[in-house]
């Protein structure tokens, strides 16, 4: 039987910080593909609370015991990064209609830039459908309890950064 | 190196008739997964123009020269069919917001019925974003030209059924 | 100066019955174009409360004193009707997102059938944003007051048909 | 202190059958209002699996131990029913965008019929965001497991009706 | 008869400035609940044209003759403010789909922070469906007429601030 | 025959830079109206990559050989500009749902400011449905190929500004 080439998907994002919604998507990703590369975006128009190194380091600790998950970082165009990686699939999460439209636009532009890279959408668990990095930062900065909304491995450092001295 | 298990996705639908939009999704599917099973739904609340046998036969002729594509049919719950197939992924196409909501509801129900089956969405080519089996039937029945909207292998029989004697 | 060709737009619909929302769109249409042809659809999958003749007759009485408005009927494909009319514009009303998606699909298919016919969308007055022929029939049949929701010229006959003997 | 008039809300629906999503909305309703009247719609264009009497009886058993909840039935226009009830609020559930548009249209028409009746929307628990009576019937009829999707008091009779002899 | 506890709803917002849309929502709120607390948000990421004191003062003057309406201000998390107020209901206005998604996300996060606080949505009058504080500021700053878009009690000071010397 | 007054539409935008999507809309505009005025917005909250003069100059070169197209610029309110122009129609492009809502709000506000100015929406070609000035700038700045996404007359200067020295 011809040797089966593993399917690798890139899961790109700013991950500022990494949330339980992101984590649930990666878990569904490794049930769908052989390998998922969590690709942390370096250049982003958003001013982030955590540096690129910190965001990469947090992701590595979260997936320490998941051999199907790799963590990397990239700058510039996502499509250029995927082209020089072993992947030919971009994996994105869908939560609601407004996600859909933005993702649709990005996926069609990426397809124009490289028609051989497929964008595939997975749905977050409904438990995390309202969750985003920005709403977590908003709640934490205003004294709200974000326990359980970020993976436990990074909870303390996220609180320390967002609510110094808490 | 541990033997890599091929990734198989089920692409379910009524396919009454099969459109160029469906075809473009399957082509993107086999660039993403090792194998795609086109699963033609037997039991459907819609009264179809083509019988189940005809719809299965048309799909088989369309993908005759595509070894990565299998054609099958199923009755009852999609999730039950996938459970006894080699696949653990359901592949669906997304065209617009209204698709999104219906698909979201179905995917969450399927996930409740079997949390190990992942629903994955791909986007049709923008050329076919307006295309659906029902709009093709509507146009053909009213004397419109549907050339190029269904795969050429089945154009004559689709016209013959929708516009007898044309 | 070269002679200016008047711009004519076709405003197609089932108009079962004609509503104040339809009327407000036609009024905005004749402020935009030189002439508007209200084209009443003969063949429709919906079973209508009023026959084609009745719907055409009602529209004619409503626009009796509006020289910029013509009333006609058509069967089969809208695009075929427009092609043999003096118009090259199809005028449609937009009320909400779900309208938008259906209209988007129809407009792209019509554009595929004849790229020289432009579909143009106008917005109903916000007063009529919730109004549709079907919600009017629903309310009237259940004894609700639809005064002011259909043009006064046709109020009596609409009530007589929907709530016989009222 | 002037005597406080209790706030009563009418929660209308076909409830064919009553789902856990409906139940979670009523529970949130009685935390918001003093009393909730579950008003089962008699006249409906949908052909129901359960008669009006059966649907009323099921709702009564579900809320047997909830003094803040009353069960009633109505025919004709919802607004006319609310006008002769102690309520001046209509309570509706929102799950997703497509709900939103339909509800928006109904609420604006109801407001036109009686500006003193307020329509108020509550959000279902995210656990039930994909749930509807029709998707439950669809799954059950096709042999799927709907345990936990309808209140336990009515599970047996719902299964018996949808999958006779199971 | 057991003493009826009045239902109080908190209507939070930046109100920069207060609009006729906001006013119409509060009017519908006091037809639904016994008391509405207009809670002006202190901490906001948006840089406001009016200080917190000015926004609170304007709201107080607008509702001077409405005993069912109280005006207050809050900082930090809305849920924390509601918890120490007599209210257990958050009242929000819905205008269109994009509102819906943002509100949905906020309401689900608030529910996670305190499951006993219910978020309830009312619909603005269709007259104000296009109105927002930002579009009013945009129009006024560019010399447009905003008469009738803000309550008359605050029109002069809003114009004076947005178009000094007009 | 009474002399026919030509129909002129204003097509307003920031055009930073002008895209093939904008171009395709203007081409459909001159098939619908006698004349289209491309009105480049001076005052805009967005910080643009090209000055107003550069944006006007680029548009003029693009439509050099199109006598039905005029290029102008305006400051302040669009409605005020249209009122002193020969046009009584504002022409806007619709790509997706999120466009729709923003456009809906703007059109209703413009209608409030001047009920005699009609806003009319045309749909971009599906080829450009994902295209916007901002996504083009984003891709170009990150080294992506934007050939064919802006009219060829302005490609070199757009690249020179976005990727100096390329």
Swiss-Prot record, chains A, B, C, D, E, F:
NCBIfam families: coaD_prev_kdtB (TIGR01510), cyt_tran_rel (TIGR00125). ATP binds at residues 14-15, 22, 93-95, 103, 128-134. Its main location: cytoplasm. It comes from the Bacteria. It holds the Pfam family CTP_transf_like. GO terms for molecular function: ATP binding; pantetheine-phosphate adenylyltransferase activity. SUPFAM superfamilies: Nucleotidylyl transferase (SSF52374). Substrate binds at residues 14, 46, 78, 92. PANTHER family: PHOSPHOPANTETHEINE ADENYLYLTRANSFERASE. Homohexamer. This is Phosphopantetheine adenylyltransferase. GO terms for biological process: coenzyme A biosynthetic process. It comes from Maridesulfovibrio salexigens (strain ATCC 14822 / DSM 2638 / NCIMB 8403 / VKM B-1763) (Desulfovibrio salexigens).
